[in-house]
């Protein structure tokens, strides 16, 4: 996975980038890039803590590349960073990337080998999981794929996602 990286999108909380350590704790050994905008007052703290793993993008320039669908000028949305990741990836020579928010505290399996719902089982070999996801992505015509999130399993074993696991038309974070 030499041409793959995980981008962690963060703003204003360099001391609470939980996702970085969570990735490592769950067995991800690949490249991690923290994506921070130039208007973030704490960007220097990110650089101090994470060094060359931080990429700072021009938020105003990013805003000019798409319809913001926003009548306000405060630019308090993650969409700027999400869209900037494509240029960042190209500049870094990264062909494939995963975007994550900065507050992930765990990666879990929700199904066993028999496709039976299990409420909680930690992923320990995240490198392997992401490698398989990347191979799946390459084998499809999909423009994006995503992992399920904890909220998808509200209701536990009686919830819709647990009773009838399937591909969903939803990608978040």
Language-model regions, residue ranges each:
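Active-site-proximal specificity loops/subdomain of glycosyltransferases
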Residues: 38-98, 105-118
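Short internal beta-strands
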Residues: 33-37
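Conserved catalytic core of nucleotide-sugar-dependent glycosyltransferases
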Residues: 107-173
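N-proximal low-complexity "stem/linker" segments adjacent to membrane-targeting elements
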Residues: 1-27
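Conserved phosphate-coordination/catalytic loops
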Residues: 10, 14, 72-80, 120-127
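A structural signal for short, well-ordered beta-strand segments and their strand-loop junctions
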Residues: 96-101, 144-148
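Short, solvent-exposed loop/turn segments at secondary-structure junctions
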Residues: 13-14, 62, 103-105, 150-153
């Amino acid at each position: 996975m030499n041409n793959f990286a995980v981008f962690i999108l963060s703003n204003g909380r360099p001391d609470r980038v939980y996702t970085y350590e969570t990735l490592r704790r769950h067995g991800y050994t690949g490249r991690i890039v923290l994506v921070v905008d130039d208007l973030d007052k704490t960007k220097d703290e990110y650089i101090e803590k994470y060094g060359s793993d931080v990429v700072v993008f021009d938020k105003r320039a990013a805003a000019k590349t798409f319809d913001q669908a926003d009548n306000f000028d405060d630019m308090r949305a993650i969409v700027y960073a999400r869209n900037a990741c494509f240029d960042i990836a190209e500049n870094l020579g990264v062909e494939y990337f995963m975007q994550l928010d900065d507050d992930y505290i765990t990666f879990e399996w929700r199904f066993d080998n028999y496709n039976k719902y299990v409420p909680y089982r930690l992923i320990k070999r995240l490198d392997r999981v992401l490698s398989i996801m990347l191979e799946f992505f390459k084998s499809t015509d999909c423009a994006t794929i995503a992992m399920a999130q904890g909220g998808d399993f509200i209701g536990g074993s009686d919830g819709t996602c647990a009773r009838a696991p399937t591909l969903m038309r939803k990608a978040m974070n």
